[in-house]
């Protein structure tokens, strides 16, 4: 790993964990530069505490949303630096990609094989853009929702222009009308962007995520010197808090922290 890449990764890891330079370097050396594994390493050692920043992808880029007649699509395109995310060629590519994403209902194979306005396929335009800008650019993920019997609500965080920003959340609610629920739907979308829940309820959180968190918690407690008989008891309390903190209905409402979303 070059010194520049190492320093960039240390900076990212420090921003995500709040941990000092030396410990971040040790973690990156131990994990061969893998940021996600470095976070896990620091948490198991008890050096870093879990935070929402850690669950965000350590990359720049743009997210875009498009809605029309009850249908809504989202797409996220990642770059390596914020500088590229402000590049006009990159922005225009993302805008056209958002239109294609909506038309193809977020089928990534169809997206890549769709011709853009210049007559060139998306996948080839992407290669050309990477060559021109000199940075890795990827279509990270895309999604499409059809909610003709209800309402869609979206929130764009750090919007650069309409329907484009750093983070986008969408709430799909069936069987309601806009007149009665627009304000609530928009606020829930804003809450999700701020709180980043894994699932609607705690029982819906992916078992692999829960198992991994429990493994980290148990390692952290063991490394703190607590006796073995205390590990299970403390782990239960910590994993219960984790499940509540990361499920929408059990999170504290950002508009009124004394209440839960449910």
Where are these regions (language model features)?
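N-terminal assembly/interaction segments in proteins that build large macromolecular machines
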Residues: 2-262
